[in-house]
Amino acid sequence: MAEKVVLAYSGGLDTSIIIPWLKENYGYEVIAMVADVGQGEELEPLREKAIKSGAAKIYIEDVKEEFVRDFVFPMLKAGAVYENKYLLGTSVARPLIAKKLVEIAEKEGAVAVAHGATGKGNDQVRFELTVKALNPDLKIIAPWREWEIKSREDAIDYAEKRGIPVPVTKKQPYSMDRNLWHLSHEGGILEDPAVEPPEDVLLLTNPPEKAPDQPEYVEIEFVKGEPVAVNGEKLSPVELIFKLNELGGKHGIGIADMVENRLVGMKSRGVYETPGGTILTFAHRELESLTLDRQTMHFKQMVALKYAELIYDGLWFTPLREALEAFVDKTQETVTGKVRVKLYKGNIYPAGITSPYSLYVKDLATFGEDNLYNQKDAEGFINLFGLPLKVRAMTQKPYQK
């Protein structure tokens, strides 16, 4: 009996041709695994496609709730954004997909797992670090690092010779990754950062110039940093993100066109659509501005930077990320309230924040007289706060330039 390998399968170009390749080159029995992270497409047809491509069995795992609850919301609460733009939609999904890959491999008694990430990208690292963290005994096969196929055109030719249909053409070889948090676009004409993305690239989001001429107000309610309702309607985590994707996409929210620094050492250009995630990130920051004290907020901003790097680099299942999550959860104990935003032609504007834990005291902030703040006290504060500067100026000796 042949040994088994579990393949992270999407039905796209790369994983479609990996099934016959694994059988031809390793002699493995191939078990395909599809993780439903909210791709927005019907996944059942992949059963027939995987079997026709040579798979012995296929699992289709609905992990949308787990994805949002255990991965997206912790990232949102941390405020993790990579290089000021990227809301980590692909990055944060990979550890969950790899986790399911390991679980099915253990269930099936497989000796190996395989993925379709290329040898130039970040995903190979994210998949494999997760596998190493969860089951280091599993062999990892990355065909893109082994086979003779060197381009997407070669891959298309390989598929056509074996009668495998793929949703890619040689004229427009965009690489897309979609889940309920975002949609990414890479490859083709997008590889030239001097070229504006064609309008037909956008699938979730209206171009801002085609968005409605009237703004729309949206109210989001948070409890301990997690969104729970939109416009007063309580929603499940998955329903909430789908709802905000619809609203944000209509108004051209969440389009990020960026050149990023890949973990593997090169720069790459990608176009990301994250309408709901962009609204949530904005609203969450607004609420934190009302409920977090200055020192906690500033330190949390440093944590957010590191948290984003850990996610981007595939280090989700690490002691450091788990420790940072514990810190973040502590900061979120008072991040409860409602945030009202205005959506208009690609922009989000704050339109009101309320919280039972608000640290904003109007009497302190006003420029008028009050009984809580004596403006004369400021002189002593400035003298003490500025003492190091004064001492340095008094003791500094002239030096030659």
Swiss-Prot record:
Gene Ontology biological-process annotations: argininosuccinate metabolic process; L-arginine biosynthetic process; urea cycle
Pathway(s): Amino-acid biosynthesis; L-arginine biosynthesis; L-arginine from L-ornithine and carbamoyl phosphate: step 2/3
Alphabetical keyword list: Amino-acid biosynthesis, Arginine biosynthesis, ATP-binding, Cytoplasm, Ligase, Nucleotide-binding
Family: Belongs to the argininosuccinate synthase family. Type 1 subfamily.
Cellular compartment(s): Cytoplasm
Reaction equation(s) it catalyzes: L-citrulline + L-aspartate + ATP = 2-(N(omega)-L-arginino)succinate + AMP + diphosphate + H(+)
EC nos: 6.3.4.5
Main location: cytoplasm
Enzyme class: ligase
PANTHER family per the UniProt record, alphabetical: ARGININOSUCCINATE SYNTHASE
Annotated residues for binding of L-aspartate: T118, N122, D123
InterPro entries: Arginosuc_syn_C (IPR048268), Arginosuc_syn_N (IPR048267), Arginosuc_synth (IPR001518), Arginosuc_synth_CS (IPR018223), Arginosuc_synth_type_1_subfam (IPR023434), AS_cat/multimer_dom_body (IPR024074), Rossmann-like_a/b/a_fold (IPR014729)
Residues holding L-citrulline: Y86, S91, N122, R126, S175, S184, E260, Y272
A single MF term (Gene Ontology): argininosuccinate synthase activity
Subunit-structure text: Homotetramer.
GO cellular component: cytoplasm
Residues annotated for ATP binding in this entry: A8, Y9, S10, G11, G12, L13, D14, T15, S16, A35, G116
Protein name stated in the entry: Argininosuccinate synthase
